[in-house]
Amino acid sequence: MDWLLFRNICLLILFMVVLGVNSEFIVEVKELDIENGTTTWQTVRRQKREWIKFAAACREGEDNSKRNPIARIRSDCEVSQRITYRISGAGIDRPPYGVFTINPRTGEINITSVVDREITPLFLIHCRALNSRGEDLERPLELRVKVMDVNDNPPVFTQNVYTANIEENSDANALVVKLSATDADEDNHLNSKIAYKIISQEPAGAPMFMVNRYTGEVRTMSNFLDREQHSMYNLLVRGSDRDGATDGLSSECDCRIKILDVNDNFPILEKTSYSASIEENCLSSELIRLQAIDLDEEGTDNWLAQYSILSGNDGNWFEIQTDPKTNEGILKVVKMLDYEQEPNIYLSIGVRNQAEFHHSVASQFQMHSTPVRIQVVNVREGPTFSPSSMTFSLRGGMRGASLMNYVLGTYTAIDMDTGNPATNVRYVIGHDAGSWLKVDSRTGEIQFSREFDMKSKYITDGIYAAQILAIDDGSGRTATGTICIEIPDANDYCPVIYAESRSVCTHASSVRIYVNDHSFGSPFTFCVVDESPDIANIWDIRSINGTSAILMTEQTLSPGPYQIPILVKDSHNRACELPQTVLLDACFCDDHHVCLHSSTTGIYTGDITWVTDDMYGTVTDDGVRQSNVGLGPAGIGMIILGLLLLLLSPLLLLMCCCKRRQPEGLGTRFAPVPEGGEGVMQPWRIEGAHPEDRDVSNICVPMTASNTQDRIDSSEIYTNTYAGGGTVEGGVSGVELNTGVGTATGMVAAGATGTLRKRSSTIGTLREYQDTGMNMAFLDSYFSEKAYAYADEDEGRPANDCLLIYDHEGAGSPVGSIGCCSWIVDDLDESYIETLDPKFRTLAEICLDTEIEPFPSHQACIPISTDLPLLGPNYFVNESSGMTLSEAEFQAEMAAASEPMIHGDIIVTETYTTSDPCVQPTTIVFDSQIPPNVVVTETVMAPVYDVQGNICVPAEIANTHNVYYAERVVASPGIPDMGNSNISDACIGPVMSGGILVGPEIQVTQMMSPDIHISQTTGSTSPMTSQHRVTRYSNMHYSRQ
């Protein structure tokens, strides 16, 4: 029974689904056909219970009731039952109320009033279909009623009056102001699209501004705006909607534009010349006014003038200032003029503005000068002091009557009219703070009236100041002068001269004086005080050092006493108050310049040293000292004793050295230095460990039989010569000359012999190494002979910088299709470029546009097969080659390294130009098991001579197709034999002429060297020395005979 219930339920659900799918909500919209004048109903069916959105529209401001009903809604459920339709939303149950109504039975929607789009641009009506129980039979439907816009709103400007400023002479298209207007009509509609237009301009004339039709931006039309012509413009701007159409609405606004002033006008003076007069010795705060004319706006820096005196004011008598109210220049006299010096003064006045000129006229400005003549009027002048102040100095040490009688000096006035000393004047002391001075009323002599204190408060920095007045008896004019008196400082520790009396000869007299320095004021300055003309003319004093001087005279003195006043000043320019007197007694002298009647036993004249003892001798006038000293017996004995001690001193030293060492006592034993210490001198006479003996005498190479297998004897001798070396970070910096001679014999297949000769020079930094025990005498002799041999060879060698001509340059390939072998290029190994000579490597770098790293010097071992079975027929290959070598030698001077050098070698490669004998045909044995028609491409570093045997490849690649076999030979300390029984079955087969192969394609590329059979150490005794061979590559093609 359960399945029956389930079946019934499923059938019921299926029935409901079918019923729901087939139901529909129909909306009918009534539209008016304007062209035909008919009204039609359009039915919109909603399938699958989906409501269609209502798209009806109404025009604002119109009576739309003639279009009722504007819409009709209907549900397909009304077929089976009674449905009531209801609507809600704005215009129905929300403001504005009562706009729309609906027939609940038929679903017709009517509009009942006029609508305004600016208030409600869109009405949303919610429609419902209800059954008798008030239940929704459908989901509510939302209808949108759009209100169509009409042009019922004019544009409105944001401001009624716009105010803007712009500078005169502005560039064209300069923005002045931007106008803005709004329209309440629908956005992005023609009814709200506003167009701007200038209706009028005041003052009238040429249009100066323009307005953008769409943006409302007001801009200048040209750069002719001039504030001096019109300082204000009024514009009437209109804004019209509907893009300025005639049927559009519009409004207007005012735009007031003020033209701002710029400094584009040059100021000029009102007159072309000016003149004025002034009495001499007078000042004036306003001698003359100069009016400047400027067309710029008054009261601004563009209008305010700036005056300057261009010329004529050499004495700085005048100044000129600007009156900011009137813009006049006021010429002032700031320094008294003198008619006698300048009766007429001619000035040049220039004017400009305080503000910088506008860039449009700045380059046109030139300052013009206006002449101004100033006439100086002569007047009766009184006395004057010239200079206005005078300085007097007071000698130190003056006291009492000497101070009262001392005349400081004379300070008189002059008559300004004549320039001579004034006559009808009297002098009086003016300002005198200490009342110390007095002046003669007629002569102007100034003296002290009383004594004063050196440390008085009226003395400032050693200067006492007072004033003196000169009064004209006739006019009563008064002139004032300033007196400055230098008061010397009181020195409590003044330098004192030794005052003992001294005797001098009457002719060519001189004496040395000394100063007692109590205050450490040296060095001292000496001078003879000019108390009388005789003293100053006769005596002269010269300083010897800081504390002494020599007093001399060149005249002949009269016998008698002399008093010479000398003033001594210390390093601070301080001296005693009174000059010091040196007492001298002039007397007649004998031939030895000794005073005849003086109590002094001896005196030196003509020299700077004065001595009061006669044991030292005398000095003549020509400066030759005549000694009065005699050698007594005691002196002679001391000299003999000194000589004896000097002779006995070596014997005394010898006795001290031969004395036996005491068994005990401090310093009698020495600690022995242990053997092997750093300070021990070794018997091998070099630093470091004991040298190792080596046998290097085997320089002969035994011959090897043709059938001998795996036997290669070698020997090699190298010598190293270093020069100019210095230790740098554990290495030796200098020049290395490596010379090596090696011989080797060996057997390869049918046999081959060769000789290796090497020479290389290395300049650079070499590592430090331990010297070995070699027979240096033998090596020196050997390499000396080799050096001479090389020198002879170099002399006989042709120049290597010219074109070499050979007898046979070769011929073209007999095979015409040799150019077709370009396909081999792709398979060639280009690594040989890395081992090119530096000159060729530079060319390769230029061609390849890349930098080629030098090929590393590594050690390689090349096997040599010496005993291979003959497994097949013999093939003969004719090969010939030539080898061209060149040699370049140079000598480099040693230079000190500017900075530590890294370890490394600089290799100088030597090449030679020789010719070898003709190469005989060689026999190469190939394995018969390998099929014929095999191409062998061989890259040869240098021709191989007298080589017979098989050229073999490793056994593991013997049966491999497309094999590329490269073989490189690099100098190495040990090269084993090339023979190997393991690869005997991988020998190369015959070669066909023309380069065309049949059968297995085995391509073998081999690089060979002339020393390929040498099995020996090719290095040098220096661990940092490396040899490089720079050879050329050549291609050798084998052909079958």
From Swiss-Prot:
The chain crosses the membrane at residues 635-655. GO terms for biological process: BMP signaling pathway; cell-cell adhesion; hair follicle development; homophilic cell adhesion via plasma membrane adhesion molecules; keratinocyte differentiation. Three calcium ions are usually bound at the interface of each cadherin domain and rigidify the connections, imparting a strong curvature to the full-length ectodomain. Residues 1014-1041 are annotated as: Disordered. Disulfide bonds: none annotated. This is Desmoglein-4. Residues 24-49 form a propeptide. One of its GO terms (cellular component) is desmosome. Interacts with JUP. Residues 656-1041 are cytoplasmic. Residues 50-634 are extracellular. It is a single-pass type I membrane protein. Glycans are attached at N110, N545. Keywords: Calcium, Cell adhesion, Cell junction, Cell membrane, Cleavage on pair of basic residues, Disease variant, Glycoprotein, Membrane, Metal-binding, Repeat, Signal, Transmembrane, Transmembrane helix. Residues 50-157, 158-269, 270-385, 389-497 form the Cadherin domain. It comes from Mus musculus. Desmoglein repeat repeats lie at residues 884-910, 911-941. Its main location: membrane. It is found in: Cell membrane; Cell junction, Desmosome. It is linked to Defects in Dsg4 are the cause of an autosomal recessive phenotype lanceolate hair (lah). Lah mouse pups develop only a few short hairs on the head and neck which form a lance head at the tip and disappear within a few month. They have thickened skin and do not exhibit any growth retardation. A component of desmosome cell-cell junctions which are required for positive regulation of cellular adhesion. Coordinates the transition from proliferation to differentiation in hair follicle keratinocytes. Plays a role in moderating lymphocyte migration to inflamed skin and maintaining homeostasis of the epidermal inflammatory response. GO terms for molecular function: calcium ion binding. Strongly expressed in the skin; during the anagen stage of hair follicles in the matrix, precortex and inner rooth sheath.
